[in-house]
């Protein structure tokens, strides 16, 4: 149960970090402003709408993932990506251009500039973004309920099913799972907060 919970949330976090980090670098450089509005869409629509849309989008070739174990973390990552981007973009934009220019003058390639200047300075915000993504994935319900497999429900869905079933034992299991979820989420948030960037200045 806990292993499956961690794997699903972990995969969703990795997807959200890869896509979100690339989008954040593009937005910070000003080369992909059109992405900004698109990345806000998951925040502007309900999770139910997002999950239903994903169910339709991934239900036919060539992206037929219905019933695939990958569909749940993909949908959860869609919910988390905007938070990753919004966490990393301000830090990337605050990096002084003169630092990048100095590295380029010294002969650094664009990739070396990113690796030696941007990555170290944005590392703390990346950890915070990953923590947010993981916490969001742990508790996501609205979108996940549309795509989760019946034999592999996520914890929030399992809690919902137990609460909808009569019997004191089902209620007790729901409460126990909810308590575990709260503890895990609180732990992730507290650990993440230690890496929070206190202030971004130019």
Residue spans of the language-model regions?
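Periplasmic/extracellular loop-to-transmembrane helix junction in inner-membrane transport proteins
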Residues: 1-14, 164-169
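Short hydrophobic faces within alpha-helices
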Residues: 2, 41, 98-106, 174
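Generic alpha-helical transmembrane segments of integral inner-membrane proteins
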Residues: 6, 10, 14-22, 45, ...
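Transmembrane-helix boundary motif in ABC transporter permease subunits
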Residues: 11-39, 52, 56, 60, ...
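Membrane-embedded alpha-helices of multi-pass transport/permease systems
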Residues: 18-22, 52, 71, 78-99, ...
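Membrane-interfacial helix termini and adjacent extracytoplasmic/periplasmic loops
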Residues: 30-33, 48-78, 111, 147-151
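Transmembrane alpha-helices
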Residues: 41, 78, 85-88, 96, ...
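Interhelical loop and adjacent transmembrane-helix boundary motif
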Residues: 138, 144-200
